[in-house]
Amino acid sequence: MDKKVINDKFTEIFGEQAEATFFSPGRINLIGEHTDYNGGHVFPCAISLGTYGAARKREDNKLRFYSANFEDLGIIETSLDDLKYDKKDNWVNYAKGMIYFLKETGHDVDKGMDIFIEGNIPNGSGLSSSASLEMLIGVIAQELFNLDIDRVDLVKLGMETENKFIGVNSGIMDQFAVGMGKQNQAILLDTNTLEYSYAPVDMGNNVIVIMNTNKRRELADSKYNERRSECETAVGELQAKLDIKTLGELDAQTFDEYAYLIEDENRLKRARHAVWENQRTMQAQAALEEGDLEKFGRLVNASHVSLEHDYEVTGIELDTLAHTAWKQEGVLGARMTGAGFGGCGIAIVDKDKVEAFKENVGKVYTEKIGYAPAFYIAEIADGTKVL
C-alpha cells in the first residue's frame, strides 16, 4: 500500500489533507513463547504485514477515527475529555488507551486528531494487530505534537494500554517487536532487564512461512491469564528455597533440582516450559549467529513440543500445522507463534519447496480441520515509522 493511496483515502473520509503518513508492523516470534511475562528471553521480529495510518491535528479537542477494516463502524468520534474504555468504541479503545497514557505521563497532547487506519494483518491471527495499532497511535501523537519520548518508553505505554486499559495481562514482547523492529533483524530481548540486541536473520536458501490456522484467537477470553497465574504461583512455591522473582532467572539444572517444591503437576509443567524455553531461545540465537540453521530448526521444533505438552496452549489446529510441516521435504523447523489457542504458526522452508509445502500442508489441514489455512511469506521489516 503506498503513501498516496493512504492519503487519498484520508482526504475522502475527512475532507482535509493528512499531515503525515505512517506504517506500523505486525510481528512474529521466532522462538521464546510465553517467556515474556516470566522474565525470560524472546526472539521476535517485525514483519511487513501491518497497519498503515494517516493523521492530522485538529484545532479543537475532538478525536475522530476511521478504519477501512471496519467500514461499517464509520467515523468513531470521542474527545480528549473522554478517554475512558467503552466497549461500543471497538478498536478505538486501543487508540484511546495510548493517548490516555501519553497524557498521564505528562506528554502534551493538547489538541484533537483525525486518524485514518488500514491494516493487512489478518484479524485474530495472533500477529499482534493490537500492538501494531498501539504503536501506530503512539508514533502518530509523537510526530504531530513533537513529543520528546524515547521509543522504549512508548513501547512501555503500549503494554500499559494492553494491561490496564484493555485488560489483557500480556508481557512486553509484542509492543517491543513492533516498535523496535529492524529490517532483516530479530531482537533478542531479556524481558527481565529490557536489555536487547539485534541479530541478523540469514536463513540462507530458506524463507519463513507464516501458517494461519484461520481460527481466531480471543486473547482476553483465552486461558492466557490462567497460564500466567499458574507460573506466578509456581514462582511463589520455588521462593521457599530460591531467591528469585521470575522463572527467567533460573537455568534448567537449577530448576530441575528445585522442581520438587512445586506441588501441582500442571504448575510444574507450566514452569518447566518457561525455564526450558528461555534456555532454548538463547541457544537458538547463538545457532543462528553461527549459521547452524539445522540446530536452529530443531530448537524451533522443541519449542512447539513444549508448548503442546507442557504449556498446553496449542490445540488441534496449530498441532496439525506443525506436525504436518515437520514431515515435509525442505522444512528445517516449525512451531506455533504468539499466544496460541489458534492464530499462526511459522515454518522455515527451503525456497524451492514452498509451493509443494503449501499444497501438502494445506491439504492435510483442510481434510482434518474442515477449512483451509492461509500462508504468507514473512519479510522482516522496520518498526513503526513515518513514511
Curated annotation (Swiss-Prot):
Q: Where in the cell is it found?
A: Cytoplasm
The reaction(s) catalysed by this protein are: alpha-D-galactose + ATP = alpha-D-galactose 1-phosphate + ADP + H(+)
Site feature Transition state stabilizer: at which residues? Answer: 27
Q: What is its EC number?
A: 2.7.1.6
The record's Gene Ontology cellular component field reads: cytosol
Which residues are annotated as active site? 174
GO MF annotation terms: ATP binding; galactokinase activity; magnesium ion binding
Q: Which UniProt keywords apply?
A: ATP-binding, Carbohydrate metabolism, Cytoplasm, Galactose metabolism, Kinase, Magnesium, Metal-binding, Nucleotide-binding, Transferase
The protein's matches in InterPro entries, at most eight in alphabetical order, are given as: Galactokinase, Galactokinase_bac, Galactokinase_CS, GalKase_N, GHMP_kinase_C_dom, GHMP_kinase_C_sf, GHMP_kinase_N_dom, GHMP_knse_ATP-bd_CS
Determine if Nucleotide-binding is one of this entry's keywords.
yes
Q: In which pathway does it act?
A: Carbohydrate metabolism; galactose metabolism
> What biological process terms from GO does the record include?
galactose metabolic process
Query: What family classification does the UniProt entry report for this protein?
Result: Belongs to the GHMP kinase family. GalK subfamily.
Function of the molecule? Catalyzes the transfer of the gamma-phosphate of ATP to D-galactose to form alpha-D-galactose-1-phosphate (Gal-1-P).
Q: What is this protein called in UniProt?
A: Galactokinase
Where does this protein come from, organism-wise? Ligilactobacillus salivarius (strain UCC118)
Name the gene that codes for it. galK
